[in-house]
Amino acid sequence: MVGSAEPVVCQFYRLIPGAPEPRRADRSADGTLPVNAYRYCEAIASASSFGWYLYPPLSFSLWWDGTEIAWTYEGADEWYPLRGAQYPNFRETFQKVAPDGLGALAPPFLVQGMLPGVVQIWSGYLARTAPRWALLSRGAVNIPKTQGYENFEGIVETDTWFGPLFTNVRLTRTNSPVEFHMRRPLFQVQPLLRQCYQEPSFKVSEVADIKEDDWQRFADTIKPNTDQMRVLGHYAVDTRKRLRGGL
């Protein structure tokens, strides 16, 4: 949530009732980072906390035999072949709230991809970003991958494209259930300015091109690490002070 004076970069719209709310990603990678990394490695902690976690709208499982995919969900009595699957009873729910003429456009919850073992999973949300902002969709940052799937990464220009916020996953395990739980982040979205990914310019220079003030900055970075009695996490402390000062 933000105060009224702070502009909203991303707005999420919940379509599936009861779907878990997106949550700001946290510095501990949802509690999975080692304590030393969380306390002293600002680079890892900052990357972990960049963006928001999205969760499955219900707990479910996928089963891939190498050719066909089946799915089931909490409370179901059997496995169902997967082609395209709606969230239970969502079609009727959507028809009640959609404007006239749009009732047949309920987004599917699961869709089998064109590639073997690939499934598209919808979070239950739509998303819209401020002008010139997009969303990078990816796996949850620095959370160990132990669930038998990998997230594809993609950038969606959500300032103009207003549609379902989903992730594509590649199943990496066959002949055993791959489980997705409402309490575990399914994927992470990170806001990006368009100028950051539309082929920004770069330049390659040689060591002779390094200026004197750059050498001083290099020394300021490296010298503290040569002191065996140095205080751990000095970079983290300096970075946090600078951010608190708005620099």
Language-model regions, residue ranges each:
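Non-catalytic terminal segments and appended small domains
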Residues: M1-W161, T172-L247
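Active-site cofactor/co-catalyst pockets and adjacent glycine-rich loops in catalytic enzymes
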Residues: P164
